[in-house]
C-alpha cells in the first residue's frame, strides 16, 4: 500500500500504454529475482505475497532448473519471475514528453538555476536574476527538493546515496533483468539491459555528504564478488566503468527504507504548492 508500490503498478500500466500510443521503443523482457541460498527462500515468498497484495500480479516461483532453462548463465537455488517487467528507450521517452509539453504551449527554461522558493505571500521562485510568481508550483528537484522546500522543518535534510554502474563489453549472457535478493539501502548489484541488450551491473550504495558523481574504481572487487554470486562465470576483464547516479533519500544509512513523500496544498498549507520528496526512482 505504499506510494512506491501504487505508483509502480499504475505507472507501469500507463507507461506501456503511452509507449504504444506514441511509438516509444520498449520491450517486456521480464525480471527474475534470485536466491543464491535456501536461507533467502522466505524472502522470495515475501516478495510473492507483497506483489499480490500490491496488485503487481503474480510472481511465478522458479526452481533452480527453471532458472537454468531461462537464464543458463545464472546460478541460484530458486527464483521468482515477474513477466511484465520491461525496459524503455528513456531518451526517446523524454523527447516524446518534451513534444507533448510544447504541443500544449509549455516551455522549458534550460540552464536556469532555482535558488529559493518563498511562500510567505503567494508563491515566489527566485531564479538567475529574476523572480517568478506562479499560481501552481511543483517542487520536483530531486536531490535539492528538501533543501529548496520552504515548508520543511529546519532540522529536515536530504541524504545522498551514490550508485556505480559497470558495463559488460561484448554479447550479453542475459535475456532478462536479473536481481539478487535486496540488501540494505538498495536493491543490490543487479543486471540491467538496454534495448540494444548491452549489460550493466549496479548500483551499489555509497553514502555521500552531497552530490558527488566521481566514479570510485576502488569498489571493483566488491562488484565482482557481488556479481559472481549469481553469475559465477563473469570474466572481469570485460567490466568497464559506466556511470554513477545519486538517489535522494529522506533518512541516513541506518534508517528504515522510506516511502515517497508527496505533499499537496493540504499538507504544505500553501495553495498551489506541491512537494515531491525522496523520489529516488522513476
What are the residue ranges of the model-derived segments?
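A short coil-to-beta-strand element that immediately follows conserved catalytic motifs
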Residues: 26-29, 155-161, 233-245
Amino acid at each position: 500500500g505504499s506510494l512506491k508500490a501504487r505508483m509502480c503498478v499504475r505507472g507501469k500500466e500507463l507507461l506501456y500504454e503511452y509507449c504504444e500510443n506514441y511509438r516509444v521503443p520498449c520491450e517486456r523482457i521480464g525480471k527474475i529475482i534470485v536466491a543464491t541460498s535456501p536461507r533467502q527462500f522466505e524472502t522470495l515468498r515475501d516478495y510473492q505475497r507483497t506483489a499480490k497484495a500490491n496488485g503487481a500480479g503474480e510472481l511465478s516461483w522458479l526452481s533452480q532448473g527453471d532458472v537454468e532453462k531461462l537464464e543458463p548463465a545464472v546460478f541460484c537455488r530458486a527464483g521468482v519471475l515477474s513477466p511484465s517487467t520491461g525496459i524503455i528507450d528513456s531518451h526517446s521517452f523524454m523527447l516524446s514528453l518534451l513534444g507533448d509539453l510544447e504541443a500544449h504551449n509549455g516551455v522549458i527554461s534550460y540552464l536556469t538555476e532555482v535558488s529559493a522558493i518563498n511562500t510567505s505571500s503567494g508563491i515566489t521562485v527566485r531564479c538567475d536574476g529574476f523572480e517568478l510568481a506562479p499560481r501552481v508550483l511543483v517542487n520536483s528537484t530531486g536531490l535539492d527538493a528538501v533543501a529548496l522546500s520552504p515548508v520543511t522543518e529546519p532540522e529536515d535534510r536530504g541524504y545522498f546515496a551514490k550508485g556505480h554502474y559497470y558495463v559488460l563489453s561484448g554479447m550479453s549472457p542475459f535475456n532478462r533483468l536479473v536481481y539478487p535478493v535486496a540488501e540494505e539501502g538498495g536493491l543490490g548489484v543487479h543486471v540491467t539491459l538496454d534495448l540494444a541488450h548491452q549489460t550493466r551491473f549496479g548500483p551499489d550504495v555509497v553514502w555521500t555528504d552531497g552530490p558527488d558523481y566521481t566514479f570510485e574504481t576502488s569498489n571493483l572487487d566488491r562488484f565482482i564478488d557481488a556479481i559472481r554470486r549469481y553469475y559465477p562465470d563473469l570474466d572481469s576483464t570485460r567490466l568497464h566503468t559506466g556511470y554513477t547516479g545519486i538517489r535522494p533519500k529522506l533518512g541516513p544509512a541506518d534508517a528504515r527504507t522510506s516511502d515517497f513523500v508527496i505533499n499537496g496544498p493540504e499538507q504544505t498549507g500553501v495553495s498551489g504548492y506541491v512537494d515531491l520528496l525522496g523520489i529516488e526512482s522513476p
